[in-house]
Structures are given as structure tokens and as C-alpha cells.
Amino acid sequence: MKLRTRVKIAITSSVVLLCAGFALYSFFRLSAAEGKKDFNLYELVPPSASAVFVTDDILEFVAEVDDLACSKNQQYLHVSKLFSYLKQYLYTLQEEAPHGLSRQMNQMLISFHEPDNIHNQVLYCRLGEGDRQLIDRFVQKYVSSLYPPKTFKYKGEDITIYPMADGDFLACYLTSDFMALSYQKKLIETVIDAHKNGKSLADDPTFAEAAAPKKSPAVATVYAHLEGMMGWTEFDMKLRDDFIYFTGVCHETDTCFTFMNVLRQQESVEGFPGEALPSTAFYFTKQGVTDWASLLSYGDMQETGVRTSDVRNRNRELSHYLMENAGQELVACLFQREDTLQEAAAVLSLSVSDVTEAERMLRSLINTVSAEERGKAPLITFCYTANKAYPVYRLPQTTLFTQLTGFAEPTSHTYATFYEGRLLLAPDENSLSRYIRQLDKGEVLNGAIAYRTGMDNLSDSYHFMLMADFDHLFHQAAKQIHFVPDFFLRNSEFFRNFILFAQFTCADGVIYPNIVLRYKSE
């Protein structure tokens, strides 16, 4: 064989071997990267979590948050202090990585724990190749040397405590695969426990079903459950201009007596109630009621106050009355009185199948009230308008109004009247007269632009819906409302700028919540 031929063969072989070596190196590096990508962050989340926020693209999510109308008005989403800190330093951190954040690090998860406050949260993210070194460089550059961090051992793992400029302390659990941060060292310890003993949120079958991979992932997803209201429910999050949308699904089908399972027993209703609500209404609910027994039983379970035997007996009598006479829809509302400094007026409106018979039976019911129970106040008074006098009936003491509306009323007195084919109930006579007079004058909510805009995003057929103008609602210190989670009140400085619209629809046993937060521009 000629020398030239041997040289060609040697060069060709070297190139082939070099390419093969490079291919193998790339394959193993890709395999390692895929291994990191497959790390399940949910295996770190303690089972005590009440809500979880997750995004697979933190940069895109932050960009969408910055593009919201509220952000442009310097009203930033501060419901998570950890996220606020991350957002503050995210672009700085990105500058430290010339090729951008790794795919693993771009995924972020925050778990929320009871009692719900800005400190009882944990932030998690995966780490790709080189991310650990990136974080170390970032910490060395931006953490003050005047207050050096301290490291503690817990079950063989390092927890580093960093003092913050505002006096808080940030606990960090950092490995080559992931990072977990919290203002509570004890929460980081529970993260380590979940990671080591394998008892995490990932092992909860209800949560695992809700968090199953999706074909079309949203920019962010929230998983939440509320005791007595709903089990783990998935909400895809979308942000645009004046709106924050949460489109959800709840597969929970267990036998727990939750509000979601009560909805499954009801038929849907159609149409929005704006024409039958005062223009000053700032909160209302509307729902279908075809199974009164389950709805009344749920309300009875939610009531925490002490009831006398007389009140329990009256509750049963009025429950039977409603089951015999009420129709298939229920509307509850809060609205302003003429003196806006007074506590809000409250009215429950029920459709009635036969008004004449319902009124006759109501008169019979109040006639059974004993002289001692009646007291000196008359059982029947009148609400006078320009065209008519409406009889107003003072019912025996009952807690059904609170059970059906979710309003924590300070009194067990209830007043009733019939108006436009509906039974109206209220905790005081003034609420009834104010309601009737506003509607008689045509002063209804349907004319409000904010109301109509919110309805545009909702379905005309549903099982339950809610509207809450938080700015007005937060001024009602005496009103505790069952259907509005305390989370909104604890973050009132941000949410007071929003109106909440929520709708729950049931199809084939699956509940589909649809929540819209509309920003009220100045």
C-alpha cells in the first residue's frame, strides 16, 4: 500500500473517531441534561401545602406581569414576597448568564402553607449544568459581606441562612439538582423531610391527577384546595391588559361533603341577574338549586355558631317551607344603603313556583310563633313605595339566611316579603325596602360598565357564579363572606383594585371553575 493511501486512511480514521467521540460526548451530556430535566419538583413539596404556583418559563411570566395595566400603574402583584424578590433580581441574574437561564432553572414553583402569610411559602427551581456555580457567583457578588450567612445541618443536609436588608432571613437548601428558598427555616426542614422520606405532595393521588402533564401548557398554573369548598383544582393562568384569567378543572369525585360536590347535585341556571340587582350592588352570587336537601345540609355543616334547640327547630321548619315553595334559583347580594357610611344591606332572592300559596304558607308559619318569641315588635309591617305597599314578615329566629348566603350576620332575625314573583329575605327591614325602591326606580346593576365587561367573559349557562368588587367589600369589616377566601383580604392592598368574577359549571361530574380578575384603572 502506498504511503499516500496510508496517510489518507489514517486521516479519515482520525476524523471518524473524532466525530464518534464528539457524538458520544454529546449523547452522554444530553442524557445527563435530560436526567436533570426529569427531576420532579413536586417530590420536594411538603404535603401540608394548600396551594402551588408553577411556571415553566419564568422569564415569559415576568414579562406578562410587567405588561399588565396594574403593573404599568405601579400596582404590582405582591402576593408572594419570594416572587417579588426573585422578580427584582431576575434580570440581574440573567445578565450573569450570557446564554440565558437554563431550561431547568427557567421552571419555578412556589408552595403556599397555612397559616397563609408572606413568610409561609417555599420557592423551588431545578438546576441545570453550571447553574449551581452561577448561583454561587451571584451570592458572592450581591450578598453583603457585613452579614455573613450561617449554615446549619439538618438530617445531613445544609441549610444556609442569609440575612436580608429588610430584617428578614432567607433559608436556602441548595443541591446540584435543585434549589429551595423560604423565609421559614422550619419549612425548608419539611422540604428536606419530603425529599428524604418520599412523603411529598407528589404522593397525593388527588393532586397527582390535577397536576398531570398537559398537551398545551399555560404560561403559569395554580393548584389550590380550600377546606370544605373544593379539593385539588387546577387553574391555568393567563394575563392580558386589565385582566387576569384562571381557567380551571376539578376532577374530585370522592364522598367529601364539599361545595363542589353539592354543585354536582344541582341543575344549571341560565342568564345573569343584573336586571334584578340594585345598581349599588358590589357583591352577588347566583346558583341553581334543584336539590335543596344537599344545599341545606352543606350550609348547616358550615355554620360554626352555637344554636339553641328553638333555633334548630325553626331552621327545620323553614327548610321544609323552602323545599315546598322555592324555585330553582337563588341570588344573594350586598349593596350600599343611602347612607354609605352604614354597613351594607343584604338580601337573598329566591324564585317561587306559586307566590299566592307561598305567601299563605308563610303567614301560617309565623302564626305559630309564641307570644314570648314575638316580643313587642309586630310580626307584619309594610314597605311603602309610590305604587304599592308590600307586607314584610318577621320570621322566627333562624340561621338559614347565613347558611344560604354565606354572610356572617350578627343577628338571627330574618324578614321576608314577596316582590315581582320572588321571595326576598333580609336580616333587617331597611335592606328589603332599599332593594325594592332601587329596582322600582330602574336603578339596576345591568347598566354598570364594569359589570357588563365582566359578564362578557362568562358563560350564559352555569351552576354557580359570583361577583365581588373588592374595594367596597374590604370596607365591610363586619361582613365575613364564606365564598371569598381570606387570601384576598390578606392581600387587600393589591386586590382592592380588582373586581372578581367567578363561575362554576358542571359537566359529566367534572367541575369547571372560571375566574376573572378585572383591574379597575384609575
Where would I find each of the regions flagged by the language model?
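Conserved aromatic
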Residues: 128-129, 182, 352, 426
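Juxtamembrane low-complexity tails/linkers enriched in Ser/Thr-Pro and polybasic
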Residues: 1-2
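C-terminal regions of mature proteins
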Residues: 497-520
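Structural boundary/hinge residues at secondary-structure and domain interfaces
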Residues: 6-12, 16-161, 207-229, 247-345, ...
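Composition- and surface-driven signal marking solvent-exposed, interaction-prone regions
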Residues: 193-195, 260-263, 297-299, 360-365, ...
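Active-site proximal loops enriched in glycine and acidic residues that flank catalytic Cys/His/Asp
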Residues: 286-288, 334, 350-352, 426-428, ...
